[in-house]
Amino acid sequence: PHSFKLKGNKKLGGNKNLNYPFFAAKPFIRNRTLQIRNGGNDTRCRFKDPALQTIIQSSGIDIDGQSYQPVHEFINGKYIGVLNVREPNNKHYVYANYGWDEEEIDQFEMNPDSGYVQKCGTDEAFNTWYALSANAADEATYEEIKKLVDIDEYTNYMAMEFYLGGADWPQNNIKGFRRSVDGRFRFVTFDLDGAFGSNDPFNNFMGRQTYTFDPLYGCEVNRITAEIKLVTIFKNMLQNATFKKRVIDVYSLMGGSVFEPT
């Protein structure tokens, strides 16, 4: 079965919201769109991503992620199969979970075609974070960075990604957002189909400070080689002793608590 989206429509009443508690884990959120997903690149079991995200959410750790609900798909009465309903992972995720419209946020993503893409707002705060990170070892500078980034959620997110070892990250599958006025960046977990695809995720990440993005997959045409600033930022921030200790502690928490069988 194919993946598709459902979108709210003002013509059907309301304000584009789909007024129904689709997700038991988040009955309170205001969905304007839903993803009906077939498993993406996980073509065999189809639920690697929702299973991992459910484990993460159930642990109680502070990481933004998509809720999940399996559904049966019928088209004109014909049974198609089992798919999974997901929250969106873009500006509509921010609205559903935080109530901020796209005019109120800065949001970016990493795209395998072209690298960093600004989806909403401006890149001013992100570039300030990037510039400050060069001096992150200094505690005063680190405190300034903490005004731009939710350090706890960011560290949790990074440790989780390292633990799961996705093969298509960080050159892809990264989305960050913040409220434009005095907000702090948070990161949304999504598309963990490639989890466990890397046997050395930390060093693979560190080795992708420069990456060649491919607009036409498999064709040496219009390729873009660029810095992945998120790798540079993380490398720089590890120079801060406080941050480095937190990364080590949270990574240990991943294996010892979040993903520990109970």
Report each predicted region and the residues it spans.
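Catalytic-core segments of enzymes that bind and process phosphorylated/nucleotide-bearing substrates
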Residues: P1-T262
